[in-house]
């Protein structure tokens, strides 16, 4: 009887070890998965021109998602982006790009985005307001783990996350947009630029 119990315990212990090893391997796969990054697609800017997102590599990018007809949350995000842009004037466009992507591409046309940009006094040399094919825009949104959800009336839900991307196009930081402190973001953008200057990967 005792011999049988010992055999059973050994079997259970071996099974537990196998289970633990499998769990550790699964956790390792989760940790090493590919980081969020801009997909290699083209979008349309506020002048109706195609822009390849891959062309932004080599620059630090601050990314958000907005849409026309969103006076509350989106207006706040635009205002905060404006503060960031004003603090980065020397580097804006050459080393840093602000990228505002509409999450309502079915309705937001380039001319509407241009009107929004102008009414916000946006520096269009380094701040892109873009739309595109719905499938392409969805790819950008989902690349950062966000769902482009709809409200009961069919209008797009607010996306409040803001993303800081390194020069390789990969996500370095994520912010809650409504709580984002522009000057803190500016400091982190400058840190990202300094890392590039210093040859850091």
Cite the ranges covered by each PLM segment:
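Short active-site neighborhood of thiol/selenol oxidoreductases, capturing the structured segment around
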Residues: 54-75, 81
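Hydrophobic beta-strand anchors of alpha/beta hydrolase catalytic cores
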Residues: 62-63, 98, 162
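N-terminal "domain-start" segment that seeds a small globular fold
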Residues: 27-54, 79
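Short, small/polar residue-rich loop motifs at catalytic or cofactor-binding pockets
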Residues: 37, 60, 157-159
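Structural microenvironment flanking redox-active thiols in thiol-disulfide oxidoreductases
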Residues: 78-140
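Thiol-/selenol-based redox modules, centered on thioredoxin-like
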Residues: 151-201
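Sec/Tat-exported extracytoplasmic proteins
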Residues: 60, 67-69, 85-92, 120, ...
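Sec-dependent bacterial lipoprotein signal peptides
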Residues: 1-25
